[in-house]
Amino acid sequence: MNTILVTTSRGLDELLKQEVLTLCPDAQIKQGPGTIQFEGSKEDAYKLCLWSRLANRVIWVLASGKAGDAEALYNTAMGIDWQMQMDSRHTLSVQFIGTNFAIKNTQFGAVRVKDAIVDSFVEQGLPRPSVERKTPDISVYARLHRDNVILGIDLAGASLHQRAYRQETGDAPLKEHIASAMLMRSGWTENTDAPLVDLMCGSGTIAIEAAYIARNIAPGIKRSYWGFTKWLGHEATLWDSLLEDAISVQKPSCGGGIYAGDFSRKMVAIAKANADFAGVFNDISFSQQDATKSSPPVATPGYVVSNPPYGERLGELTSLIPLFSDWGKRFKEAWKGWHVSLLSSNRDLLRVLKLRATKDYAMNNGKLECRLANYVLDEQNTVQFSEDAGNHEFANRLKKNLKRMKGWVKSANTNCYRIYDADLPDYNVAVDRYGDWLVVQEYAPPKTVSEDKARKRLQEVLLHLPAVTGVSPKNIALKVRAQQKGSKQYEKINQSGEMMEVFENGARFLVNLTDYLDTGLFLDHRNTRQKVKALSQGKDVLNLFSYTGSVSVFAAMGGAKSVTTVDMSNTYLDWAKKNVALNKLSGPHAFIQADCTTWLGTHKGKYDLIFIDPPSFSNSKRMQNTWDVQRDHVKMLTDAKACLKEQGTIIFSNNKRGFKLDETAVTALGLQVENITKETIPEDFARKGKIHQCWVLRS
């Protein structure tokens, strides 16, 4: 008898214990987080390699000992007679799990164990074994816990979840042992004659594992690589006998009581290919289908077991929330009497189903902490859920806003405007409409609001927006707006490069709703742009910190003699050129790539009208110094005054909260100061009123 250590994913410990006791009835088990340990025979270890649907590794323990520091670890490893385990011609790898105060990373621990093994051969005058990381002849396993280490031979060689039947996968494949655990926790494995359906099958893992279970196919039967094949302790005759037994107990085809579907034809094709390679193609009925419109394939209720998308990436929520909402409604309409089991790392998405779970289980899918939620679609759970948007606080406020704005929207001559701006403290978002699109900007919640609550509120917003506005969920862009610092204020957050055309007061503009935090058009400056247009007739106009040039467009449309557009970003200057071209404005136009804070101080040109809308703060690498609008605005206006013609005008604006114009210093420059903030705040931003401040400064 020898100590055998079996590992699995967190959350599967109890299931693994039951499985080990089924395969090795006499085992006296010691259970730990993600591990099972017992005294067993080589036959027990081989059975687990071949038959365990839940284990990752089966370790034949060689020794356990002190590992309080690197020297102790080395000595414990040196205490093993490695010449009894492997030949010097064999390749090896060391997998090291755990850290302690002295051994701070697993790579260092693995190297010390490897050094001990190699040195043990060298001391005997034998050649040094070489390292092979992918498919070594001998895979050594080391597990460190506090100051003790367990060392052994990994009989699996590679994780047992790799059944060797998956030829292709999707973007987020489900591990095979997790699929088996889902089937066990769902209750289906106790009633395998019942129909089983996976409505989001991906590469087919759940359905294939179900077919293996129904037909009593050993999960390791197709594996060709094992960690024991070259091990000197391997008993080939015993292993071959177990393989023969496994083949003899396989059941014939289960007759197609397993169903797998996916919205993607490509994934259905991949699932079919994997099932064919696994030898269970005829046991599974495949179909391309939309889960939100699905119906049971048979009249007899059974089990739905699926691994839906989790929404780990922020932008996915806009499509997943309505998907889960529709899916929940479909379950209630069409799947009465069925058992449903869904795995997710996002409990809030599961709540969108509006189903009451009877049980849920923790299990890690890779590094993601997930829950398997079990539902019974009985009478209590299938009462039709129809959430009236008018009865929801956010939806009710949004409807109220849209009703109040209806007349203004008709006369505003634009298809870009704000419809909600954190009107309710619990729903801390801004919602802007751009034609047939909505942009949702989630403000970072205050520290007094928990992340869970903020996430739940955001999901409610995304759920109700399509119903109230009539905008498709696919046309909702989601962004998180926290306080931006330095160069991050214009950083890319996506790479789509997709532009759409919008209009405002007779002008057309290109916006990008997904790639940046801002879209390319500051909606709160709609009135300010009209002010510039009204003052531009026959004037030489300078637009500083020009962004995408919308002010330059209106200056030209207002009859400006010339327009000079200055920005530090070539990307935004190119965008500005496109906006000017889109409106067929002939110029003359000058586009200058420069740091406005230094360019203005050395520029010799003179202008009738200067528009300045700087960032609150910047420390871009392209700038010689940092910029702070509160600290530096007088210097900026001093330089601007030097470029201003007699009887010229500066329009100065910024968005810094709490900003205070140094009127004394500005007046001393010979400029008359007029605060025009109130008239530059558009109707759709009037509820807040503090989106920006704006002044006219006249010489």
UniProtKB/Swiss-Prot annotation:
Catalytic activity: guanosine(2445) in 23S rRNA + S-adenosyl-L-methionine = N(2)-methylguanosine(2445) in 23S rRNA + S-adenosyl-L-homocysteine + H(+); guanosine(2069) in 23S rRNA + S-adenosyl-L-methionine = N(2)-methylguanosine(2069) in 23S rRNA + S-adenosyl-L-homocysteine + H(+)
A GO term from the CC aspect: cytoplasm
Coiled coil regions, renumbered to chain: none
Protein keywords: Cytoplasm, Methyltransferase, RNA-binding, rRNA processing, S-adenosyl-L-methionine, Transferase
Pfam families tied to this protein: Methyltrans_SAM, RlmL_1st, THUMP, UPF0020
Database matches in InterPro entries: 23SrRNA_methyltr_KL, DNA_methylase_N6_adenine_CS, RlmKL-like_Mtase, RlmL_1st, SAM-dep_methyl-trfase, SAM-dependent_MTases_sf, THUMP_dom
Superkingdom per UniProt: Bacteria
UniProt domain THUMP: residue ranges: 44-155
UniProt subcellular location: Cytoplasm
Signal peptide: none
EC number: 2.1.1.173, 2.1.1.264
GO MF annotation: an example: 23S rRNA (guanine(2445)-N(2))-methyltransferase activity
Xref: CDD domains: AdoMet_MTases, THUMP_AdoMetMT
Job description of the protein: Specifically methylates the guanine in position 2445 (m2G2445) and the guanine in position 2069 (m7G2069) of 23S rRNA.
Family designation: Belongs to the methyltransferase superfamily. RlmKL family.
Protein name in UniProt: Ribosomal RNA large subunit methyltransferase K/L
Originating species: Alteromonas mediterranea (strain DSM 17117 / CIP 110805 / LMG 28347 / Deep ecotype)
